[in-house]
């Protein structure tokens, strides 16, 4: 494991614990021996108020490679979400998470999670990852929002 990646992730964890957006979760997983695994984080993103996503808390796994922060983490909703920019596997399709697009080593975990929250309600139809959600979003917005609200209810923390 890269010392650079671990040191950066330890800094990220410290910064997150000191200050993070309300309702969001980002916690490194534990190894079988009880030690912290900074390369694998369990996160949760709340649906934004005033949107069909409101009320939901959407669980996401963030996996870091040894060359982080040179390469972005892989962000994957578990279970996968109904959304035009979420692959059927749950992986998020977002330009800041792609090395050959808008990824920059200075981007923080907080910025990634806020960016994904923004993407939930504002899909990028230029870069679809899920055919069904994309088609319904483009052809029947009322049905799309109905499904999103049902999903938010299903993933409500209460």
UniProtKB/Swiss-Prot annotation:
GO terms for molecular function: ATP binding; SUMO conjugating enzyme activity; SUMO transferase activity. GO terms for biological process: cell division; chromosome segregation; definitive hemopoiesis; embryonic heart tube elongation; heart looping; hematopoietic stem cell homeostasis; protein sumoylation; regeneration. The active site is at 93 (glycyl thioester intermediate). The record marks 100-101 as: Substrate binding. It is an enzyme of class 2 (transferase). One of its GO terms (cellular component) is nucleus. It comes from the Eukaryota. Keywords: ATP-binding, Cell cycle, Cell division, Chromosome partition, Developmental protein, Mitosis, Nucleotide-binding, Nucleus, Transferase, Ubl conjugation pathway. Residues 4-157 form the UBC core domain. The record marks 4, 25, 57 as: Interaction with RANBP2. Residues 13-18 are annotated as: Interaction with SUMO1. Its EC number is 2.3.2.-. It is found in: Nucleus. SUPFAM superfamilies: UBC-like. Pathway: Protein modification; protein sumoylation. It holds the Pfam family UQ_con. Signal peptide: none annotated. PANTHER family: UBIQUITIN-CONJUGATING ENZYME E2 (PTHR24067). Accepts the ubiquitin-like proteins sumo1, sumo2 and sumo3 from the uble1a-uble1b E1 complex and catalyzes their covalent attachment to other proteins with the help of an E3 ligase such as ranbp2 or cbx4. Essential for nuclear architecture and chromosome segregation. Mediates nuclear localization of vsx1. Required for progression through mitosis during organogenesis. Forms a tight complex with rangap1 and ranbp2. Interacts with vsx1. Belongs to the ubiquitin-conjugating enzyme family. This is SUMO-conjugating enzyme UBC9-A. It comes from Danio rerio.
């Amino acid at each position: 494991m890269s010392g650079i990646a671990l040191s950066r992730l330890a800094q990220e964890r410290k910064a997150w614990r000191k200050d993070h957006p309300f309702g969001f979760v980002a916690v490194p997983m534990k190894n079988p021996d009880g030690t912290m695994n900074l390369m694998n984080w369990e996160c949760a993103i709340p649906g934004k108020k005033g949107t069909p996503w409101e009320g939901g808390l959407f669980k996401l796994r963030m996996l870091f490679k040894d060359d982080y922060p040179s390469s972005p983490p892989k962000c994957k909703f578990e279970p996968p979400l109904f959304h035009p920019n979420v692959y059927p596997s749950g992986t998020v399709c977002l330009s800041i998470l792609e090395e050959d697009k808008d990824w920059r080593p200075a981007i923080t975990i907080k910025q990634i999670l806020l960016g994904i929250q923004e993407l939930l309600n504002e899909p990028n139809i230029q870069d679809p990852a899920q055919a069904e959600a994309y088609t319904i979003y483009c052809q029947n917005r009322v049905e799309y929002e109905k499904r999103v609200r049902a999903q938010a209810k299903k993933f409500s923390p209460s």
